C-alpha cells in the first residue's frame, strides 16, 4: 500500500527521533509537517522562515535519505515556511522551482526538448529564484538607493532603459537579492515571461555540455529565447575565451531583440581581469549601479526587518550591538542574527546583549577592552587629553579623536550606544551613530586617519583579542 505524505513524514520523524538528540528533534523536526507529497517531491512546512532555513540547510538531505530507505526510491525534499506557502498557494508555478542552481539541461536532447516545450511551463521552472528575494524584503539605504531604483525600473519596463543593467558590489551586499527581485516582479506581472536566472558557472557548464553532446544550436536557442536574463557573478568569466565568445553573441542577440539583460559582479566591467574589450564595452553601454556596504542606520534597519520577517522579537539594544559589530556585509549581519536566534531557541535563554555577545565573538572569549583604555590610547595617538574627549569642545582635533573613540569603543567593548555616549560626557546615542558613520566613511578615503586608527587598535590589541 502506497504511503500518503503524512504517513511517510510520520515514519521519517520516528526514524530520526532515535538518531537525534531530544533538543534537536523537538526544536527542528517535530514542529515541521508535511504539506504535500506528489511526483516524488515531499514538501515540508516549518513554522517560520528561520526554522525552514535551518531545516533545509542541515537536515533536508538526511530526511531524503531516510525517506528513500522507507519507500524504496529517491525523492526530493522541499522545505518551506508558513509564509512561503501562503504566498505560493495563489501564484504561478514558480512555487515548484527549486532554489538549487541546476544546469539548464544535462544533455543536448533535454535542451532541445525544453526549447520545444510550451513557454507557459518551461520558463517559469527555469529561474531557481529564492522566494525571499523580492523587492519588499529589500531594505533601501544610501548605499543601495540607485541600484534599487534601477532594478525596479527594468522590472517595470524591461528592455527600455538601462539595458544592460550592471549591478556591482562586494560580497553579501544584496546584488543577488535585487537580481532575483527583478525576476519575481516580471513573473508576477507576466506569468508567461521567459525569465532565466543563471550563474556564470552554470552558463559555462551548459556550454561545455552542449559542445560535448553536439547540442550548440539547442543551447543557443534556449538562452536566446529569454525575455529577461539575469546573470550572476559574471567576474568568473575572466580568462574563459570560448565562454566569453559565446556570451558575447548571446548578449548581442538578446539586446538586438530588445530583451532585458541584468548582470551582477563583485567589480565594475573595467576591473574584471582578462575580459574582452568588446564585452567591457557591451557591459558598460547601459547603467552600472554600485552597491556599497551599508551604514550603521541601514544595518539596523536591515536587522529589524529581518527580525520582523522571522517573527522574532529582538531588543533594540541587541540590534544596535549586532549592527555595530558586523559592518562589512549584509550576509555577515544576517548570519549573526541567525546564530543569536539559534542560540536562544536551543538554550531557552532570552536574547540580550549580555547573553548573545560571547557567542557572537569569534574568539569565544569575549572582548575585554575597557572604555577607559580606549580613551587613553586614542588620546595618546591623537594628541588630545581624556578630558578633551569627554568635553563638548568642537575643535577639529578633539572632535575627530572623540569620533574615533566612539568608533573603537563600539568595536572593542560590549557597551550599547547610549552607554558609549555616557562615557563621552553624556552624548546622545544619535551622536554616537553619527560618529561611527563618519569614521567609517573617512577610513575609506583618508590614509592618515586609517593609519592612526590602526595604531590605536594595535595598542589596544583589539584584533588579536578577537583572534585568540
From Swiss-Prot:
Pfam families: Bac_DnaA, Bac_DnaA_C, DnaA_N. One of its GO terms (molecular function) is lipid binding. One of its GO terms (cellular component) is cytoplasm. Residues 86-127 are annotated as: Domain II. It is found in: Cytoplasm. Plays an essential role in the initiation and regulation of chromosomal replication. ATP-DnaA binds to the origin of replication (oriC) to initiate formation of the DNA replication initiation complex once per cell cycle. Binds the DnaA box (a 9 base pair repeat at the origin) and separates the double-stranded (ds)DNA. Forms a right-handed helical filament on oriC DNA; dsDNA binds to the exterior of the filament while single-stranded (ss)DNA is stabiized in the filament's interior. Domain I is involved in oligomerization and binding regulators, domain II is flexibile and of varying length in different bacteria, domain III forms the AAA+ region, while domain IV binds dsDNA. This is Chromosomal replication initiator protein DnaA. It comes from Synechococcus sp. (strain CC9311). The lineage of its organism: Bacteria, Bacillati, Cyanobacteriota, Cyanophyceae, Synechococcales.
Amino acid at each position: 500500500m502506497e504511503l500518503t505524505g503524512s504517513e511517510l513524514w510520520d515514519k521519517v520523524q520516528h526514524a530520526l527521533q532515535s538518531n537525534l538528540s531530544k533538543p534537536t528533534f523537538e526544536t527542528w523536526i517535530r514542529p515541521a509537517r508535511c504539506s504535500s507529497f506528489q511526483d516524488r517531491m515531499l514538501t515540508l512546512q516549518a513554522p517560520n522562515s528561520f526554522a525552514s532555513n535551518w531545516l533545509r540547510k542541515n537536515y533536508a538531505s538526511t530526511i531524503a535519505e531516510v525517506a528513500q530507505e522507507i519507500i524504496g526510491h529517491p525523492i526530493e525534499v522541499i522545505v518551506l515556511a508558513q509564509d512561503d506557502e501562503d504566498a505560493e498557494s495563489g501564484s504561478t508555478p514558480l512555487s515548484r522551482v527549486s532554489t538549487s542552481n541546476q544546469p539548464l539541461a544535462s544533455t543536448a536532447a533535454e535542451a532541445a526538448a525544453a526549447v520545444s516545450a510550451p513557454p507557459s511551463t518551461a520558463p517559469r521552472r527555469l529561474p531557481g529564484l529564492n522566494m525571499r528575494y523580492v523587492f519588499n524584503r529589500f531594505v533601501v539605504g544610501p548605499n543601495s538607493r540607485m541600484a534599487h531604483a534601477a532594478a525596479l525600473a527594468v522590472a517595470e519596463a524591461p528592455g527600455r532603459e538601462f539595458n544592460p543593467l550592471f549591478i556591482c558590489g562586494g560580497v553579501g551586499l544584496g546584488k543577488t537579492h535585487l537580481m532575483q527581485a527583478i525576476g519575481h516582479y516580471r513573473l508576477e506581472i507576466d506569468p508567461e515571461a521567459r525569465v532565466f536566472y543563471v550563474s556564470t558557472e552554470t552558463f559555462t557548464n551548459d556550454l561545455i555540455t552542449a559542445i560535448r553532446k553536439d547540442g550548440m544550436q539547442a543551447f543557443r536557442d534556449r538562452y536566446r529565447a529569454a525575455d529577461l536574463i539575469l546573470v550572476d557573478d559574471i567576474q568568473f568569466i575572466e580568462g574563459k575565451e570560448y565562454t566569453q565568445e559565446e556570451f558575447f553573441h548571446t548578449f548581442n542577440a538578446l539586446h538586438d531583440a530588445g530583451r532585458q539583460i541584468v548582470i551582477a559582479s563583485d567589480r565594475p566591467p573595467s576591473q574584471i581581469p582578462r575580459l574582452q574589450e568588446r564585452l567591457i564595452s557591451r557591459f558598460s553601454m547601459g547603467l552600472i549601479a554600485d552597491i556599497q556596504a551599508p551604514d550603521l542606520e541601514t544595518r539596523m534597519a536591515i536587522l529589524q526587518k529581518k527580525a520582523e520577517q522571522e517573527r522574532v522579537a529582538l531588543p533594540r539594544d541587541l540590534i544596535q550591538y549586532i549592527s555595530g559589530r558586523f559592518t562589512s556585509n549584509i550576509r555577515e549581519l544576517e548570519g549573526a542574527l541567525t546564530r543569536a536566534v539559534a542560540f536562544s531557541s536551543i538554550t531557552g535563554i532570552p536574547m540580550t546583549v549580555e547573553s548573545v555577545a560571547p557567542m557572537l565573538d569569534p574568539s569565544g572569549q569575549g572582548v575585554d577592552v575597557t572604555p577607559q583604555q580606549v580613551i587613553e590610547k586614542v588620546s595618546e595617538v591623537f594628541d588630545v587629553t581624556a578630558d578633551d574627549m569627554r568635553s563638548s569642545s568642537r575643535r577639529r582635533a578633539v572632535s575627530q579623536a572623540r569620533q574615533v573613540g566612539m568608533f573603537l569603543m563600539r568595536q572593542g567593548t560590549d557597551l550599547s550606544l547610549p552607554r558609549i555616549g555616557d562615557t563621552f560626557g553624556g552624548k546622545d546615542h544619535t551622536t554616537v551613530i553619527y560618529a561611527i558613520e563618519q569614521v567609517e566613511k573617512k577610513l575609506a578615503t583618508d590614509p592618515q586617519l586609517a593609519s592612526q586608527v590602526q595604531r590605536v587598535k594595535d595598542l589596544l590589541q583589539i584584533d588579536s583579542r578577537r583572534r585568540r
